[in-house]
């Protein structure tokens, strides 16, 4: 091994660039990415579990399926 095998923590590059927290806008941290804290991560999870977030469905797709069955 060259260099003794030890790495200096200041030379380690982050895995990804810091982005604003998806919940509050503060800089995200690696442990809770893309959030800044466990609190923001749990707030977002609660919104998904309570149904506050929903993936929209186009009405045209359901009408097209009905016509195919005829």
Swiss-Prot record:
Stored HAMAP family: DNA_gyrase_inhibitor_YacG
| A Gene Ontology BP annotation from the UniProt entry | regulation of DNA-templated transcription
UniProt subunit comment: Interacts with GyrB.
Listed name of the protein: DNA gyrase inhibitor YacG
Outline what the protein does: Inhibits all the catalytic activities of DNA gyrase by preventing its interaction with DNA. Acts by binding directly to the C-terminal domain of GyrB, which probably disrupts DNA binding by the gyrase.
Q: Name one GO molecular function term.
A: DNA topoisomerase type II (double strand cut, ATP-hydrolyzing) inhibitor activity
The alphabetized UniProt keywords are: Metal-binding, Zinc
Disulfide partners: none
List the SUPFAM superfamilies.
Glucocorticoid receptor-like (DNA-binding domain)
The UniProt entry's sequence similarity note says: Belongs to the DNA gyrase inhibitor YacG family.
Q: Gene encoding this chain?
A: yacG
This protein's species is Sinorhizobium medicae (strain WSM419)
Cofactor comment text: Binds 1 zinc ion.
């Amino acid at each position: 091994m060259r260099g003794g095998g030890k790495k200096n923590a200041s030379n380690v590059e982050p895995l990804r660039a810091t982005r604003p927290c998806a919940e509050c806008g503060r800089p995200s941290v690696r442990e809770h990415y893309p959030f800044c804290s466990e609190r923001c991560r749990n707030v977002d999870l609660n919104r998904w579990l309570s149904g506050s977030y929903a993936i929209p469905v186009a009405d045209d797709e359901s009408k097209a399926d009905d016509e195919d069955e005829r």
